């Protein structure tokens, strides 16, 4: 599907130079004083991980990859593969662990429903939910009278990830973590 260069957004997957590329940063729209407007894109190759910077005229058309999405339930990890179960047919599939960002892998908890995006029947990317609930395993003790302030303290979560949390939280509490930037959202209800 063709897409106008100025309609490209961060996270779009494009077919460019016979490869699949993900737009890894927000496109930079520039209108110089002289000449036509252009869009600067930072793209990452989905297979090799290499980054390139390309400049396109705002009137150029690029090929946006058509991906199929299907929901699966994460079961467990086996060597360099993840075992997922199709929620409709209950078939199990193996996908490479590399289709998920390494900083988000600890947040892939058993029985989590994930979306697998495929291109020509090949898994390209595994999309986690926007937020997950995780328990704080270790953090410095509560500060008496602490309120919501700008100061945060480090905490280690039950999945081994490190995150900054407000000072009023203590070990054993469950929190909601936003996976986009791996940040604290709120106490779990």
UniProtKB/Swiss-Prot annotation:
InterPro entries in the cross-refs: Elong-fact-P_C, NA-bd_OB-fold, Rib_uL2_dom2, Transl_elong_fac_P/YeiP, Transl_elong_KOW-like, Transl_elong_P/YeiP_cen, Transl_elong_P/YeiP_CS, Transl_elongation_fac_P
Question: GO molecular function terms here?
Answer: translation elongation factor activity
Gene3D superfamilies linked to this entry:
2.30.30.30, Nucleic acid-binding proteins
Instruction: Give the domain of life.
Output: Bacteria
Q: Answer yes or no on keyword Protein transport.
A: no
Lyase as a keyword?
Answer: no
Q: Where in the cell is it found?
A: Cytoplasm
Describe which pathway this protein belongs to, using the record's wording.
Protein biosynthesis; polypeptide chain elongation
For this chain's UniProt record, which GO biological process terms are given?
peptide biosynthetic process
Q: Which UniProt keywords apply?
A: Cytoplasm, Elongation factor, Protein biosynthesis
Give Gene Ontology CC terms.
Answer: cytoplasm
PROSITE patterns given in the database record: EFP
| Task of the protein | Involved in peptide bond synthesis. Stimulates efficient translation and peptide-bond synthesis on native or reconstituted 70S ribosomes in vitro. Probably functions indirectly by altering the affinity of the ribosome for aminoacyl-tRNA, thus increasing their reactivity as acceptors for peptidyl transferase.
Protein family (similarity comment): Belongs to the elongation factor P family.
Q: Which HAMAP family match?
A: EF_P
**What is the protein's given name?**
Elongation factor P
Query: Which source organism does the UniProt entry give?
Result: Orientia tsutsugamushi (strain Boryong) (Rickettsia tsutsugamushi)
